Amino acid sequence: MTTRTPPSGWISRLAQGSLVKQILIGLVLGVLLALVSKPAAIAVGLLGTLFVGALKAVAPVLVLMLVMASIANHQHGQKTSIRPILFLYLLGTFSAALTAVLFSFVFPSTLHLTTAADSITPPSGIVEVLRGLLMSMVSNPIDALLNANYIGILVWAVGLGFALRHGNDTTKNLINDVSHAVTFIVKVVIRFAPLGIFGLVSSTLATTGFETLWGYAQLLLVLVGCMLLVALVINPLLVFWKIRRNPYPLVLTCLRESGVYAFFTRSSAANIPVNMALCEKLNLDRDTYSVSIPLGATINMAGAAITITVLTLAAVHTLNIPVDLPTALLLSVVASLCACGASGVAGGSLLLIPLACNMFGIPNDVAMQVVAVGFIIGVLQDSCETALNSSTDALFTAAACIAEDDQLAKNALRS
C-alpha cells in the first residue's frame, strides 16, 4: 500500500511566510520589470487590477456582515469605544488641515495654471456635499452593496443588527457563521497581496513614470512632507494622549501593515479588509472595529484635508491673494468638513478643492485648473493620501480600544 506524499513545502512556506517581506519582494520585482520591459510590465498590471477588484468586491459584504453580526450579538451593558474613536477621527482630520496651513505658509508653493478641466463637474457647495451624504444614507441596500456605498451599507447593517437582536439564536448563529466565512475569504485574498502589488507597481511605472512629477517637485514635497509629519508626529501625539505610553510601536505597526497596502491600492474601501485583519491581529474588540473601520474609511480623511488645504493655498499664493490668520483657520474648518465628505464625491478630495477656493473668490475655471494639477501629481499624492487615511483608521481604533482596556483594568484593581 502506497502512501501519498504531502504537497511540496514551498507552498506552505509561502502561505505562512511574512506578508510584509513578500510585498517588499513584489515591490522590488515590479520596479525591475518596469525598467526592463514596459510591455511586460503593462501586461502584468492585470494582477494588480484583479487584486484591487477582489478587495473591492469582498469589502461591502464584509462590512455588512460584520457590523450586522456585532450589533445583533451585542449584549446589553457591553461597552464599545465608538464615541472616542469618532472624536479622534474628527480631531485628527482638523489637526491635519491645520498642519497643512502651517506648511503652506512656511513653504509657499505656486502652480502653472494653464490646464483646463472643463469636463469635470465638482459639487457646487458644502451643502451639496452634505446632501449627498444624507442621500447615501437612504440608499437601497442592494444598490449600496453594488456601488460600495459604505454610508448606506452602515445604515442598513446597523438597522438590521438592532432588529435581529430580538431574533432567534439560530438566526444569530447563521449570521455569525456567514461573517466568519466572509472573513476567511478576505484572508485568502490578502495572501495574494504580493502578486497584486507586483502588478500595480509594474503597470504604474510603465504607463506613467515619474517624469511629469518633477515639474511639481516643491508642491509634492510640501504635500508628502505634511502627510509624513501628521503620520509620524501629530498622530503619535494624539495616540500618546489617549494611551499614555510610547505610541510608536503601534504607529509603525499600522503604517507597515495597513499603510503599505493602501499606498499601492489607492483605495480606502479596498483597504477595509486589510484593516479588519490588522485589528483582529491586535486582538481588539470586534464589536468596536467592525463599525469604526468602515466608518473611518468614510469620514476619517486627514490626507484629503491636507490635499485640499495645500492645493487651495498654492492657488492663493499663485494669484497673490492675501490671507490673514482667521481666514486660514476658517480654511482648516472648511477643508476638514470637505474631507469628511470626500468619500461621497466621485473624484474624492480633488473635486472638493473648488469649494475651498470659493472662500477666496477664485473663479471656478481657475479652481478646475488646480484640480487638473492634482490629477497630474495624483500618482504620488493619491497613494500617500490613502496610506495616511487608511492607516489612521486602524491606529485610532487601536488607541481607543487600548485606552478602554486600560481603564477597565484600573477599575478592576480599585474594586
Curated annotation (Swiss-Prot):
Catalytic activity: L-serine(in) + Na(+)(in) = L-serine(out) + Na(+)(out); L-threonine(in) + Na(+)(in) = L-threonine(out) + Na(+)(out)
Pfam families reported for this sequence: SDF
Compartments in which it is found: Cell inner membrane
Superkingdom classification of source: Bacteria
Coiled-coil blocks: none
Keywords attached to this entry: Amino-acid transport, Cell inner membrane, Cell membrane, Membrane, Symport, Transmembrane, Transmembrane helix, Transport
InterPro entries on file: Na-dicarboxylate_symporter, Na:dicarbo_symporter_sf, Ser_Thr_transp_SstT
SUPFAM superfamilies (alphabetical): Proton glutamate symport protein (SSF118215)
Its membrane topology: Multi-pass membrane protein
Annotated S-S bridges: none
GO cellular component, one term: plasma membrane
Gene Ontology terms describing biological process: serine transport; threonine transport
Transmembrane annotation, as ranges: 23-43, 47-67, 85-105, 144-164, 181-201, 220-240, 293-313, 333-353
GO molecular function: neutral L-amino acid:sodium symporter activity
Family from the record: Belongs to the dicarboxylate/amino acid:cation symporter (DAACS) (TC 2.A.23) family.
Role according to the record: Involved in the import of serine and threonine into the cell, with the concomitant import of sodium (symport system).
Protein name per the record: Serine/threonine transporter SstT
Lineage of the species this protein comes from: Bacteria, Pseudomonadati, Pseudomonadota, Gammaproteobacteria, Enterobacterales
